[in-house]
Amino acid sequence: MPPESNSQAIIVLGMHRSGTSAFTGLLNLLGVDLGPKLMAASPDNQTGYWEHTEIVALHDRLLAALGSRWDDVSRLPEEWWLRPEVAPYREQIKAILSRDFGSSPLWALKDPRMCRLMPLWKMLIPEMGLSPVWVLVARHPYENIGSLDKRDQFSWQKSELLWLRHNLEAEYFSRDARRVVVTFDQFLADWAGAMERLRAAIGLPWPVPPEIAAEQAARYVDPGMRHHKAADISRLSAWSREVHAALLAGAEGHETDMQTGMDAVRHAADIADSLYEPMLRDRGGELEQQLAAESARFGEISDCLQEMRVKYAEAKEKLAARKAELDENKARLKAFERTPGAKLNRLLGAGA
């Protein structure tokens, strides 16, 4: 059944490696329902990802259907969420939410891919009678890029573009909705204060009161979660510095200042996208054709190699058969040489 009308959802947004996992893990300690099956922890994220496995897999399939993937820095197609082929994904998401959160008074979802896919979510959530609170978790771009470099070995430029793309889109598409902006610094320094801001936006008490969860939360929110610290920010582009400043303003409650700062960068980025994306896509198409040609050539070589293996196996089998035949003949000859007739022939030959 659909989530009850008084069901409250929290949607956690943020770039990959921005602290969204730590934030969502704390929601779990406060009793927020995260669903029945979550992505397992890994050496890169030992405290857990806290992501709904089915939702993440569905997001990946949707991005692939749109010709994209989670680490694609390009814009998605115009009004992609209105395409007929996207409708089945919307219905699948609604079915998952109804099944897993139908009776949950307070639940949350977190997947960085939602930053890119928010238009679809903003369409389907009202269809289910829900009014979520969106939480944008922001981390200093220098730290975020360093974390991506360690995990994925992305170039600085790609990581910075991903950081910009995710934050610009998450901020833009969460406008005109209940939202809270929290920086990773705020979360580490005062998790209780960050959660109180979110609780006030929700208008509901936490299922597990913070004073009860405090001891466990204090152990969970460890400053050691920060493996990368902002250092030489001169490496950052002006756009990243401006977006970071805007997010800091939003985290302090200055909504207008945040939107103004984000709009300035978004406008410039849109102009750059319109200039460079066609060229990059053409180049990408050329590379795909080259890859297809090389793949075909590799296939031909593989087929040839397989044919040679078959011929080699056949030759080896024939050689083994000939050797066996030769061994058999040698054995027969030795056996014959031991017979009386063979000995007599040798004696007669010697007498002659």
Map each language-model feature to its residues.
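Boundary detector for helix-to-coil junctions that initiate low-complexity/charged tails
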Residues: 252-352
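PAPS-dependent sulfotransferase catalytic core
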Residues: 1-89
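Conserved phosphate-donor/acceptor-positioning beta-strand/loop module used by diverse small-molecule
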Residues: 110-114, 121, 128-149, 163, ...
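A structural motif corresponding to the C-terminal end of an alpha-helix
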Residues: 96-105, 169-180
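Short, well-ordered alpha-helical microsegments
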Residues: 20, 115-119, 191
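The conserved 3'-phosphoadenosine-5'-phosphosulfate
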Residues: 39-46, 136-146, 175-246
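Glycine-rich phosphate-binding loop used to anchor ATP phosphates in small-molecule kinases
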Residues: 81, 85-123
